Amino acid sequence: MAGCKTMLSSLELGKLQREQHAHDMRNHFDIVSLHKTERLKHYGLHFAKYVGRLARESAEAKPVERTIVDTLLVGLSTANTLHQDLSNENISSPSRLKQIDPLRIFADAAGRFADACEKIDHLEEFLPIARQANHDILCWVITAADERKFDLQSAIRARRSELASRHFYIED
């Protein structure tokens, strides 16, 4: 996979991935408790939801930046479920970035991820497709954040804190 400039190094992504596991164990145990194939389908639905948010543009109440951060968080959780070690991957812009509409890159990858999830039910090979689609989604996230010039790591910390506050009854 070709490389390009990114806002996050593979080591930083690996650290975020490990932190996401701890976050998920604390705040999303209902999802972590699902069978891995059901978890992947759940994440596929999230990706589809986020493509829809972005497609609605100004008709969507949630800001684009929040959707980008949410997509990254789900991508990290997805990588954990797929045993996809992001610290060993070159997360960069996909070559298809030259398309007129960059949303198509995300939609394409989300569609391929859905295809992988469907293959689970047919007992067909799905892991390589799911891993590549998740990789491409993460590339899209990095590029989208870079284009908007916002700090993903700070945004991730803020979003995780917001999500954790919903579980006021958990003592750390």
Label the model's feature ranges.
Residues 1-172:
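Flexible "arm" and connector segments at domain edges
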